[in-house]
């Protein structure tokens, strides 16, 4: 049995799925995914991120809410691919439970975003999200997105 090739989604296609644009598009590339189950993506953290101007001057740290938003955007991409939707539909961040931040995300880091579907019902998707840097957990949470 042959090993399946990763299913990569580049930024140009991501922009056809998500309505977000600079400075709020927080997924650079999808490394692989399986419809209805999971997705792995990356976000490269640049010293030029607008949030670093004030968070914190001289000690830039990516705000936790942006890590959670990146996980939600990764889930949105998975939902579009799973439901074979075209751009134009929206997924709203609907809830966060058990969010934990375990290490800072800094300029120069590459953040890996891993999302896994827990359940989907009536347009609401519950999922787990884990953001890592160099294999270390930066953030983990249970999240929900609602389709409009």
Curated annotation (Swiss-Prot):
Keyword Transport attributed: no
Catalytic EC class: lyase
Catalytic reaction equation(s): a (3R)-hydroxyacyl-[ACP] = a (2E)-enoyl-[ACP] + H2O
Pfam families linked: FabA (PF07977)
Record keywords, A-Z: Cytoplasm, Lipid A biosynthesis, Lipid biosynthesis, Lipid metabolism, Lyase
Subcellular location, record wording: Cytoplasm
EC annotation from Swiss-Prot or TrEMBL: 4.2.1.59
GO cellular component, one term: cytoplasm
Main location: cytoplasm
GO BP, sorted A to Z: fatty acid biosynthetic process; lipid A biosynthetic process
Catalytic residue list: 55
GO function terms (MF aspect): (3R)-hydroxyacyl-[acyl-carrier-protein] dehydratase activity
Family from the record: Belongs to the thioester dehydratase family. FabZ subfamily.
Purpose of the protein: Involved in unsaturated fatty acids biosynthesis. Catalyzes the dehydration of short chain beta-hydroxyacyl-ACPs and long chain saturated and unsaturated beta-hydroxyacyl-ACPs.
Protein name listed in UniProt: 3-hydroxyacyl-[acyl-carrier-protein] dehydratase FabZ
